[in-house]
């Protein structure tokens, strides 16, 4: 496994903090006029949502720093809100957000007030933290960030990362809202992930695949060790992992901790003869993992078969093989952003596009296995438009275009300067697939004028007609 130093994505020693001038400008609104109350804690300052978001993004310079000490210190200073909550903790290379969405829909169908913590967001930060599928409002975001920032300033030497701060923010929101169950998605890995400070009712490991190898390890076995790090003593485990080595590691760790392991069984297979709300064989697998988790916890949280079916059928999770109609044109948005995700997308396409090939609009990040991803996707398309992803980590359109030409078996390939330009180029194509990065899907959701976190009673991506942002097909 990688040593501790290999986990820090910079040349600084582990835990080092490099403060830059622009950060002082960003956080100034949080410090201006700050006084301390009688208990020694800094009084919160009113900040705007723009100031709150600027502060949150300033924390991204500290990258990913593995370990739980900072998160535990923050949780203790905040009064350990996690101790007042019940959790289902979900890890996995792919599908963990979808499994959380299925579980959230099922337990809401059973009448529970739920908390949903996932990442990343597509458009708005509040999508990460939802109470009964209502995203955190801008006003509540600003209030909580101001209060939590004030608290952090009282803790000597503590400089949280973006995800550490966001995790404690979520715990505060859920405790204040009085949610009855939290669907709690890991950020990266599991063992050293900030979410791993909780004691859940169940631990779920959806699957294990190759992603984030520079952090989690180069092999499936190494990555499985990190995912299995969420397993707690005596807490049951549900897994859909089918790789033999990964499954063996998960089961070995569970035995060490006297944690029973449950896989997908006959009841879930029978249940999945009914329709589910998300598209593709991989989403059937995710639904089965969610259903197995519900079955495991029925003694603690009763859920009827009809409520389970209702939740599975009603779930919405934008950007996961979701269809947008634009006149007679179908645009499919899928956030496949790593090799396992692209393989799952390829397997699902015959179900949603049984005739013909789509025009493919794709952009990818440079720290993924993008050459292999492009090699898999290019032959599936009628023609290809490559675009930059709205991230500093984007693959250049020149490099991605070359990879697509090499793999595309003579299909036309163009490079667009932006996604909006690419969408104008494909207005005449009856079917368009946009994929390669969740950041790209977030940009598409914005351009198409869609609501990115549809809950019950709202129009889903399947039902939206874009409000004139782009010319009709």
Name every feature range the model reports, one short phrase each.
Residues 5-13, 17-94, 98-113, 122-123, ...:
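N-terminal leader/targeting and accessory segments in enzymes
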Residues 103-108, 174, 377, 404:
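Hydrophobic alpha-helical packing residues
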Residues 422-450:
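A glycine-rich beta-strand to alpha-helix segment
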Residues 240-262, 295, 330-333, 339, ...:
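C-terminal helical cap/extension that packs against the catalytic core
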Residues 43-46, 62-64, 68-84, 109-198, ...:
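ATP-dependent carboxylate-amine ligase catalytic core
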Residues 389-391, 455-473:
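Short, flexible loop segments at boundaries between secondary-structure elements
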Residues 84, 181-186, 193-204, 208-209, ...:
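Nucleotide phosphate-binding/pyrophosphate-handling subdomain across enzymes
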Residues 187-194, 198-258, 360, 370-372:
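Conserved catalytic-core segment of NTP-binding enzymes
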């Amino acid at each position: 496994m990688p040593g501790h130093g290999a986990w820090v994505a910079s040349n600084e020693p582990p835990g080092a903090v490099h403060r830059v001038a622009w950060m002082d400008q960003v956080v100034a609104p949080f410090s201006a006029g700050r006084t301390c109350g009688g208990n020694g804690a800094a009084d919160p300052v009113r900040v705007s949502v723009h100031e709150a978001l600027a502060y949150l993004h300033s924390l991204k310079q500290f990258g990913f720093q593995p370990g739980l000490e900072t998160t535990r210190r923050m949780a203790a200073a905040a009064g350990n809100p996690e101790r007042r909550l019940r959790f289902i903790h979900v890890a996995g290379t792919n599908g963990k957000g979808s499994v959380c969405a299925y579980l959230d829909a099922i337990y809401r169908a059973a009448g529970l007030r739920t908390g949903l913590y996932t990442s990343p967001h597509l458009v708005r930060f509040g999508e990460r933290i939802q109470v009964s599928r209502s995203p955190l409002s801008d006003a509540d975001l600003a209030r909580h960030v101001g209060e939590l920032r004030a608290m952090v300033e009282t803790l000597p030497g503590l400089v949280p990362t973006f995800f550490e701060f966001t995790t404690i923010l979520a715990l505060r929101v859920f405790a204040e809202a009085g949610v009855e169950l939290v669907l709690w998605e890991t950020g990266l890995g599991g063992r050293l992930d900030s979410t791993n400070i909780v004691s859940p009712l169940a631990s779920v490991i959806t699957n294990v695949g190759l992603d984030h190898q520079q952090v989690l390890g180069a092999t499936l076995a190494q990555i499985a060790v990190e995912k299995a790090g969420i397993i707690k003593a005596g807490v049951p485990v549900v897994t859909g992992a089918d790789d033999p080595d990964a499954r063996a590691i998960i089961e070995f760790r569970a035995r060490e901790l006297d944690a029973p392991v449950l896989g997908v069984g006959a009841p879930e297979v029978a249940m999945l003869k009914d329709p589910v709300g998300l598209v593709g064989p991989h989403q059937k697998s995710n639904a089965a993992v969610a259903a197995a988790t519900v079955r495991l916890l029925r003694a603690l949280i009763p859920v009827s078969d009809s409520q389970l079916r209702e939740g599975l059928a009603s779930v919405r999770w934008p950007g996961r093989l979701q269809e947008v109609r634009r006149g007679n044109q179908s645009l499919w948005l899928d956030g496949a952003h790593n090799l396992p995700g692209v393989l799952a997308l390829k397997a699902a396409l015959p179900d949603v596009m049984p005739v013909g090939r789509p025009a493919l609009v794709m952009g990818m990040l440079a720290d993924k296995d993008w050459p292999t991803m492009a090699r898999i996707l290019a032959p599936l398309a009628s023609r290809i438009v490559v675009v930059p992803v709205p991230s500093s980590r984007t693959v250049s359109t020149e490099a991605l275009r070359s990879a697509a030409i090499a793999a595309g078996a003579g299909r036309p390939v163009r490079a667009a300067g932006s996604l909006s330009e690419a969408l104008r180029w494909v207005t005449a194509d009856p079917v368009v697939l946009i994929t390669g990065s969740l950041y790209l899907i977030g940009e598409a959701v914005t351009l198409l004028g869609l609501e990115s976190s549809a809950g019950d009673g709202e129009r889903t991506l399947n039902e939206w007609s874009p409000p004139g942002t782009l010319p009709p097909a």
